[in-house]
């Protein structure tokens, strides 16, 4: 094989040119293969193809000549796509990232924290938790903007730390994203219960899974457009609820009640005793605040959702730095704005809220907004809000389907999952990874034998632990990445995003999340509240992740998996490919290897 290119004529799809230096495997029927200046040898052997400009990485398995020749007849060769496409614009990135964070927790589950801690504790706890999230976000932004590939922080764990941490982090993050799919499916079911419950919980499950699958197998640009509009709708919902709060607190309601900040004055800080024993105890206020802080650690997320889009973003080193900055500001505004508003519209001592929490009532009836609307005799608006909440939950589940499938795809690329999961369809969608991620939706069937609210609580505990572990991993990976970059910075391109206060910023995030992992299930240790099931849902992921790390490092690798030498870490292959893409997209600010 003496030349670099050949042309393949697809049946019904025109001609595509493949660059030998970039492309790896697809399965399709080829109408004809036409040599370009001797790319194919006379024997007719088929060589390796490495990328399709509009379709992602492909591979053609090499077949030696066995007396056959290539002619114009249609023949089938085993080829399959193994790379996603860069089709997402800045607006897609920002809205998809916001969509992955904002679900029903911000509008419904927040009522439990309000009831336990009071409005002031709720607002202060969320504001406080935004500090470590900011530290983690800027640390993530620095390494992801420098290395914008599929599953970047997981791939950097392999490259900069060791394989054992990468394996543990990959499986934990995939589990985190997958388990949130049934969480949102159950949330939709609980919201529907606001109107009626005389139906099988399997119906909304089936409908959502089919819709998630149909959306996920489309080209990523169509997924981006759909999620852009769904996320826009969620932002409109949040802003609409802010407007509702402002108007009604000034008397714009059927009761003409100018309630203002009455609920803040009534019980700004509320005592909470998990075991019900409040005799002679003054720790109730602290435990109320702690309950709000634990809720914040579940609800607030940040840069990891942007990072999962990095491998499919156009001009990533131009788009991602802006996205990280803008998304954090917008999410902080939405989180803190929601905490302020629920404390204004609903009292933590409201009888309906108290009954909803104590009786574990399913549905949006436990949403402080819906309770406030009913108290003010606003009849139609609760139904509208509930419809909007269903859309919000569906959109969040859609985003988790995307993130989980791309995570598993990245794991397969690194060899931590079977290679079959690297296969993509012609649109660059990792279809097998989508399928295995959606299998987790079946977990939502647990609600057939238990109260939906109970199942939601189980999932919340699992998600909280996994999310905190993921934050710890992000900080560890960043510290190792920073060490490698500073050792090699004279031979590497500039950082597109430079965070401040490092390494102390990352250390703050690391310590905060490590402490919260230990705290988040503390109530299970009260003598009256010990429950093996609750303990497992709170701390099982900690033991599983430790087991994966230790097992892989000392059993699978027999202790030979050592920390990477920062002087030997090679970023050049991935960065060269990113440079080539950005040059084709007329963005040349961070050129380095091409100039060299």
Swiss-Prot record:
Q: Which residues cross the membrane?
A: 95-115, 118-138, 166-186, 200-220, 228-248, 289-309, 327-347, 380-400, 428-448, 460-480, 506-526, 535-555
* Keyword Cell membrane tagged: no
Q: Which GO terms describe its molecular function?
A: amino acid transmembrane transporter activity
One family name in Pfam for this protein:
AA_permease
Gene coding for it = AGP2
Q: What family classification does the UniProt entry report for this protein?
A: Belongs to the amino acid-polyamine-organocation (APC) superfamily. YAT (TC 2.A.3.10) family.
In what way does this protein cross or attach to the membrane? Multi-pass membrane protein
Q: Provide one Gene Ontology cellular component.
A: endoplasmic reticulum
State the name under which the record lists this protein: General amino acid permease AGP2
Tell me the lineage of the source organism.
Eukaryota, Fungi, Dikarya, Ascomycota, Saccharomycotina
An example GO BP is: positive regulation of (R)-carnitine transmembrane transport
Localization recorded for this chain is: Membrane
Q: Which residues form a coiled coil?
A: none
Q: Which InterPro entries match?
A: AA-permease/SLC12A_dom, Amino_acid_permease_CS, APC_YAT
Q: Which residues lie on this side of the membrane: Cytoplasmic?
A: 1-94, 139-165, 221-227, 310-326, 401-427, 481-505, 556-596
Instruction: Give the intrachain disulfide bonds.
Output: none
> What keywords appear on the UniProt entry?
Amino-acid transport, Membrane, Transmembrane, Transmembrane helix, Transport
Q: Any idea what job this protein has?
A: General amino acid permease with broad substrate specificity. Can also transport carnitine.
């Amino acid at each position: 094989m003496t030349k670099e290119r050949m042309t393949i004529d697809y049946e019904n799809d025109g001609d595509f040119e493949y660059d030998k230096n970039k492309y790896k495997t697809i399965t399709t029927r080829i109408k004809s293969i036409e040599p370009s200046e001797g790319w194919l040898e006379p024997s007719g052997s088929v060589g390796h193809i490495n990328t399709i400009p509009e379709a992602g990485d492909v591979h053609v398995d090499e077949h030696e000549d066995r007396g056959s020749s290539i002619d114009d007849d249609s023949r089938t060769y085993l080829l399959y796509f193994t790379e996603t496409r860069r089709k997402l614009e800045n607006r897609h990135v920002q809205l998809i990232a916001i969509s992955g964070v904002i679900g029903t927790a911000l509008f419904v589950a927040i009522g439990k924290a309000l009831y336990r801690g009071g409005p002031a504790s709720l607002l202060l706890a969320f504001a406080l938790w935004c500090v470590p999230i900011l530290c983690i976000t800027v640390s993530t932004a620095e390494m992801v903007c420098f290395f914008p590939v599929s599953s970047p922080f997981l791939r950097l764990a392999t490259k900069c730390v060791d394989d054992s941490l990468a394996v543990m982090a990959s499986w934990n993050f995939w589990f985190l994203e997958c388990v949130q799919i049934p969480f949102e499916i159950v949330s939709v079911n609980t919201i529907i219960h606001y109107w009626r419950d005389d139906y099988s919980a399997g119906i909304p499950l089936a409908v959502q899974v089919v819709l998630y699958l149909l959306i996920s197998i489309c080209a990523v640009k169509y997924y981006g457009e759909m999620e852009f509009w769904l996320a826009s709708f969620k932002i409109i919902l949040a802003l609409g609820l802010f407007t509702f709060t402002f108007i009604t607190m000034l008397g714009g309601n059927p009761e003409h009640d100018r309630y203002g900040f009455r609920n803040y004055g009534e019980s700004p800080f509320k005592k909470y005793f998990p075991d019900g024993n409040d005799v002679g105890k003054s720790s109730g206020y602290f435990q109320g605040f702690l309950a709000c802080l634990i809720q914040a650690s579940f609800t607030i997320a940040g840069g990891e959702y942007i990072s999962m889009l990095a491998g499919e973003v156009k001009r990533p080193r131009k788009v991602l730095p802006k996205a990280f900055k803008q998304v954090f500001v917008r999410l902080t505004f939405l989180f803190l704005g929601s905490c302020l508003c629920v404390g204004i519209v609903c009292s933590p001592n409201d009888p309906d809220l108290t009954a909803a929490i104590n009786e574990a009532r399913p549905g949006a009836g436990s949403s402080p907004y819906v309770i406030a609307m009913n108290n003010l005799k606003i009849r139609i608006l609760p139904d509208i809000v509930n419809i909007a909440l269903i859309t919000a939950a569906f959109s969040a589940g859609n985003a988790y389907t995307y993130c989980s499938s791309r995570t598993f795809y990245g794991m397969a690329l690194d060899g931590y999952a079977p290679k079959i999961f690297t296969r993509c369809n012609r649109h660059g969608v990792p279809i097998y990874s989508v399928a295995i991620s959606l299998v987790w939706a079946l977990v939502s069937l647990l609600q057939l034998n238990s109260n939906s609210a109970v199942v939601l609580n189980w999932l919340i505990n699992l998600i909280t632990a996994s999310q905190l572990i993921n934050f710890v991993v992000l900080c560890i990976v960043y510290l190792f990445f920073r060490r490698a970059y500073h050792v090699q910075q004279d031979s590497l391109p500039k950082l597109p995003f430079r965070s401040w206060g490092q390494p102390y910023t990352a250390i703050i995030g690391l310590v905060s999340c490590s402490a919260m992992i230990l705290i988040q299930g503390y109530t299970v240790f009260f003598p009256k509240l010990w429950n093996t099931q609750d303990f497992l849902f709170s701390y099982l992921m900690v033991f599983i992740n430790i087991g994966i790390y230790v097992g892989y490092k000392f059993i699978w690798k027999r202790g030979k998996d050592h920390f990477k030498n920062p002087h030997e870490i090679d970023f050049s292959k991935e960065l060269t490919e990113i440079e080539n893409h950005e040059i084709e997209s007329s963005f040349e600010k961070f050129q380095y290897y091409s100039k060299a």
